[in-house]
Amino acid sequence: MSWLNNPSQNFVDPFIRIKCILGDDIRIIKFNSNISYGGLMNQLEQDFQCPISIHQYEDYEGDKVTVKSKDDIMEALTMYFELKALNPTKIISTKFFLKQLPPQSQPLSSSLSPTQSLILNNNNNNNNNNNNNNNNNNNNNNNNIIQHTDFPSLIINEHEELISNHNIKWQKGQILGRGGYGSVYLGLNKDTGELFAVKQLEIVDINSDPKLKNMILSFSKEIEVMRSLRHDNIVRYLGTSLDQSFLSVFLEYIPGGSISSLLGKFGAFSENVIKVYTKQILQGLSFLHANSIIHRDIKGANILIDTKGIVKLSDFGCSKSFSGIVSQFKSMQGTPYWMAPEVIKQTGHGRSSDIWSLGCVIVEMATAQPPWSNITELAAVMYHIASSNSIPNIPSHMSQEAFDFLNLCFKRDPKERPDANQLLKHPFIMNLDDNIQLPTISPTTTLSTNTTNTTATTTTTNNATNSNINQQQQQQQQQPPTRTQRVSISAGSSNNKRYTPPISTSTSSSSSSILNNFSINIILPINLIILIFREIKPNFVNTLSRVCKHWKQIIDDDELWNKYCSDRLINKSKFEESITWKSNYIKIYKQQKVWFHNKLNHSTLKGHDKGVFCVKLIDDQGMVLSGGEDKKLKVWDISGNHHHNHHSGIVGSISKKSGLNIINNNNSNNSNSSSNSSSSNSRYLFSLKGHSGCIKSVDYQRQSGSDVSRVFTASADFTCKIFSLKTKKTLFTYTNHQEAVTCINYLGDVENKCITSSLDKTIQLWDAETGSCLSTLRGHTGGIYCVKTDQVATHGNGYNHLVVSASVDKTSNVWDTRSSSKVRSFTQHTEDVLCCYVFDQKVVTGSCDGTIKLWDIGTGKTISTFIPSETRQKNYVWTVQFDQSKIISSGKTGIIRIWDIYNERDSRSIGGHHETIFSLQFNNQKLITGSLDKLVKIWSID
């Protein structure tokens, strides 16, 4: 987070946030303090994708001021930044009221054309860019690349290989892993047959994406550290290249995986294996320390093992070069479970911090658990390491030599810890069994400059990629029960949540009880308090407030909660603006806890003859609608009160058919635990018939009261139908589509319209009373699987005229139904986009590429990418829904996944269906699913 970048000073936000209003299109845009008028207009036109002018602005007193010249606008900006200078911690915001200009018109005279590249770097970066342009003025292509990517000058200026035009002859193989901004592939050198790993990072505008900027800066740091390192126990870098589409990083391919992944496969290691690996880790650390480099993130996930048992240190994104006195480094880098006390307390650290982390890795290898695994709260772990005099538990089964070795590594005073060379002479390392031979290491080879056309352009490559490859491989092979996070104060945070070593919950201690055992008068560094605050949970607040005198003020500071929530992309609902940010987060956390941990009961509705393609839950009415391949829409009563006529005559006319009322109730905490029993809490009511093809989608309309009056269906027979639930007859058939209709949405009684998507590549808006087509949206080049409206707008102030579609053409489009025009296109999926869902100006899409992407309507930028573990089998994501606390998805595997939307992880997996799930919907504390296995399941939370 930017507010943690300088822990010794108060947070100073260099931006102001301006609410820009163009008709019904409202966006909050951040502007840098040194932006010019031309840059301002350029940024506005790029965001709104049309020529505009600023008509009015709102001053600090809330009055609207009419703009007469560009000087008025710049004077307003100056005023806002002066206000911010007076109160640096206050978030200053205002409003710009915009007007759209005709295409040939231009806003008030601008110094920049809309097509020029706008670079908003600080003065140092600007100077660096100028120097770089002077050095490369003979290469126009290179300059174009720099303007196109706007990468940090650290990469462009210090690593000239990034703008080389040499071709790299390699063939892309199987995908090894995916991340939010790129994919990792196995590569084959087409000339030599050499295998290597390649991470391709798609080029986007990093100025608007701080997460990507941190990733690229981490890459640059690794390249800088590793460009001259060559050692048998350090991952070998092959090179880096940059073109106009991708940043490609080439590195040694390690097929064995990391220590953490091996622990997940084989369990704890024997002491002999630990000795073999520890000796090689020490050899790598000795080389690094001799070359004035501290790794700062030694842990099992960053130590790779090849097929011959050779250890390779990887992931140098947290590393630091030093010279002379090394205690000057006071920033917090690494993963807390493996951190030395001086790192967490930020009292200065050096090579000895790597030695402490090595001891933690030995404990990890001996137990298959991270150190401090008996403490469940990450914040409590950090406090425990910093404030107590204890050391990690040493496994009792280890030898006396191992005990002595670990006690040396775990000296609380870093000055008392031996260095790597001294530990290599310790009996624990020297006294290997006579019949044990260390792995034979072949000589290290380097790339010669005359082979740059066939391999990589230089010998510098990004090591973070190698760690990402192996961590993403581990993610497919193990179940992570807790969260491991890399944290950084001095240079922003860089999160790594992909691997969490298994821990035993039976030995877990209460974080509150651990903290309460410590003195409450200890005063911790304010930077540590802020860092712990980032990991805080609401049920932990009261305990932390007793830790030291700073906490009461911090916990009640809603501005800090605002920054905390903003960093996690947590928003407040516009209908609940009066609640505090603290209350907002606690509310979301409670919602997550219910879905992530509470017991699940489920019932099974049997009666469909073929697969179920659509379901709809009407929870307050105790009703379920389901349709599918058998061409019938079935209506179910799940209220359990079958004698109370609350469905306006529907229950009174039940068609009692045998074989349609088979209900199984199961209790489930996870995908593996369930028990079966029979019940009659739910039953089939009747079917709505009339379609000649399978029913693909269903929606409904309520009467003026609360009962459901009309049902809307979309079918593969090219038609849509409106049914009356009271008479069970067709009221109207819509026939304007030319191919199968895939999705239907009723837009509410105010609009009284329906919007439908079809494989005929169109979206149609039509009147639900007359059936007349009001507008047709065209722009997709393939069939459309899904169309959705913003559920916050639909359930709040009404339909907001924006819809989102998912198509066979691999894109998801945002449409304005008033102008029948495409507003934005999301193109980050690599295969068909099968489903989408819209909530509070954000969209979740699921694809045949096996990924789920959360993205923002206003910018079209990816916020997060969620990757089910079965992605390697290319299992399609057919259905997805989300709200402010979670994402729920499913698809080809029949497994339902509940995702933590803010930590990008799978928090719960539910089994129950044996084939593809095509539809799901959740509402309050119920979830309903429909599957190709002919079953409809209803999941309810205790």
Curated annotation (Swiss-Prot):
GO terms for biological process: anatomical structure morphogenesis; intracellular signal transduction; sorocarp development; sporulation resulting in formation of a cellular spore. Its EC number is 2.7.11.25. Residues 15-96 form the PB1 domain. Residues 170-429 form the Protein kinase domain. InterPro entries: F-box-like_dom_sf, F-box_dom, G-protein_beta_WD-40_rep, Kinase-like_dom_sf, PB1-like, PB1_dom, Prot_kinase_dom, Protein_kinase_ATP_BS. It is found in: Membrane. The chain crosses the membrane at residues 513-533. Keywords: ATP-binding, Kinase, Magnesium, Membrane, Metal-binding, Nucleotide-binding, Repeat, Serine/threonine-protein kinase, Sporulation, Transferase, Transmembrane, Transmembrane helix, Ubl conjugation, WD repeat. Residues 441-486, 500-512 have a biased composition (Low complexity). It holds the Pfam family WD40. It catalyses: L-seryl-[protein] + ATP = O-phospho-L-seryl-[protein] + ADP + H(+); L-threonyl-[protein] + ATP = O-phospho-L-threonyl-[protein] + ADP + H(+). The keyword Magnesium applies. Residues 518-564 form the F-box domain. Residues 487-498 have a biased composition (Polar residues). WD repeats lie at residues 607-646, 690-733, 736-778, 780-825, 828-865, 872-909, 912-942. Residues 107-144, 441-512 are annotated as: Disordered. GO terms for cellular component: cell cortex; cytoplasm; membrane. It is an enzyme of class 2 (transferase). Regulates cell-type differentiation and spatial patterning, required for the proper induction and maintenance of prespore cell differentiation. Belongs to the protein kinase superfamily. STE Ser/Thr protein kinase family. MAP kinase kinase kinase subfamily. Interacts with ubcB and ubpB. This is Mitogen-activated protein kinase kinase kinase A.
